[in-house]
Swiss-Prot record:
Name of the gene: cutA
SS bond list: 31-106, 165-172
UniProt KW Translocase keyword: no
UniProt keyword list: Disulfide bond, Hydrolase, Secreted, Serine esterase, Signal, Virulence
InterPro entries, per the entry: AB_hydrolase_fold, Cutinase/axe, CUTINASE_1, CUTINASE_2, Cutinase_monf
Subcellular location: Secreted
Protein name: Cutinase
GO cellular component, one term: extracellular region
Superkingdom of this protein's organism: Eukaryota
Statement: the UniProt record of this protein carries the keyword Zinc: no
Signal peptide boundaries: 1-20
Gene inactivation effect: Decreases cellular carboxylic ester hydrolase activity. Does not affect penetration of the cuticle of gerbera flowers or tomato fruit.
GO process terms (BP): carbohydrate catabolic process
Amino acid sequence: MKTSAQQLLSALLLPLSVLAAPTGSIEARACSDVTVIFARGTTETGTLGTVVGPPFLAALKSALGSSSVTMNGVDYPADVPGFLQGGDPAGSQTMATMVTSTLSSCPDTKLVISGYSQGGQLVHNAAKLLPAETTAKISSAVIFGDPDNGDPVQGVSADRTDIICHAGDNICQGGSLILLAHLTYGMDTTAAAAFVKKAAGL
């Protein structure tokens, strides 16, 4: 028989066990109208970075409604050696895998592939790793400060591709200098969100 102290402890711990219960299975079944797979730039922290990822997500939520968009960041080193290789190879594969798994679990979502700086390299690389029948399902591709500026995103038509490069951005010119022009793409996120919305037909 439980003592009153044991009963009290059980009563106190029960709410904690409910809070700690995994909710992933419920969340996994909830597919957004728009899903963005985003790769951050070199040396940025987290998976969304700071220069473009967060303001782009905010702009998308404003344009589409907070319940209609999900942004998933690519987990990769985002280091200088990866940039010099033309985009981290493992990160590029990770992004391609995320595209495949997202379309498998949420076939009706409007899938967007996006990246900033080295993240743009990952967008190009991931698209090349995917079969044509998969890239045909990508709603749009959006790249900010693209080191591969001028190159198409394989399998994504030009009218569904938005590559944003500022005048004076050395990275967009094929260089490796980080100048002010490369650090101000947050200002372009509202227009980019409008592009995503139009491409998705929403």
